[in-house]
């Protein structure tokens, strides 16, 4: 899959701390369509490791409960691209962040029958909805090599796994 343009000068230390999933987008609705869909994960915290890998603390729904888990994202030569082993090897790329308010990232997500599916999220430091950033996220999605659209707008806060 062709990867989206990323932040070439990402400073991994500055993304540390609490984040909230505000919106999820995907190239295929099946990736996110149910509460237990495999990529419907809610990011809680990013923890850079001493070796510049990134531990991602997240929650997802399993058997009607929210399960906390973590994924270790291994750094690559590109500071904004990480490899994770989550249902197979996948690339995560950071599209954009200002470190203090928002971060957009995408993960390769081959849906059944497609090679280059993708799931993207808009993360925010607080739960306060920001329409400007949401529009910016939407514009960022339009630059991607695959057709992708916002499927879940979480700014209304109805999701149970979102803290």
From Swiss-Prot:
PROSITE patterns: LIPOCALIN. Disulfide bonds join 66-161, 106-120. Keywords: Disulfide bond, Milk protein, Retinol-binding, Secreted, Transport. SUPFAM superfamilies: Lipocalins. GO terms for molecular function: retinol binding. GO terms for cellular component: extracellular region. It comes from the Eukaryota. InterPro entries: Blactoglobulin, Calycin, Lipocalin, Lipocalin_CS, Lipocln_cytosolic_FA-bd_dom. It is found in: Secreted. Coiled coil: none annotated. PANTHER family: GLYCODELIN, LIPOCALIN. Monomer. Lactoglobulin is the primary component of whey, it binds retinol and is probably involved in the transport of that molecule. Belongs to the calycin superfamily. Lipocalin family. This is Beta-lactoglobulin-2. It comes from Felis catus (Cat). The lineage of its organism: Eukaryota, Metazoa, Chordata, Craniata, Vertebrata.
């Amino acid at each position: 899959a062709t990867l989206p343009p990323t932040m070439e000068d990402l400073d991994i230390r500055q993304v540390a701390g609490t984040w909230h999933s505000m919106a999820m987008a995907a190239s295929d609705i099946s990736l996110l369509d149910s509460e237990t869909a495999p990529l419907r994960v809610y990011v809680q915290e990013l923890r850079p490791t001493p070796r510049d890998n990134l531990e991602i603390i997240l929650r997802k729904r399993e058997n009607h409960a929210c399960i906390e888990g973590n994924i270790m994202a291994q750094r690559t030569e590109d500071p904004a691209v990480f490899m994770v082993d989550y249902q197979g090897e996948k690339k995560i790329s950071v599209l954009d962040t200002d470190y203090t308010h928002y971060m957009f990232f995408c993960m390769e997500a081959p849906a059944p029958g497609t090679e280059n599916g993708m799931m993207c999220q808009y993360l925010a430091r607080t739960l306060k909805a920001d329409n400007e950033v949401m529009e910016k996220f939407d514009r960022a999605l339009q630059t991607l090599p695959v057709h992708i659209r916002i499927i879940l707008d979480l700014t209304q806060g109805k999701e149970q796994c979102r803290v």
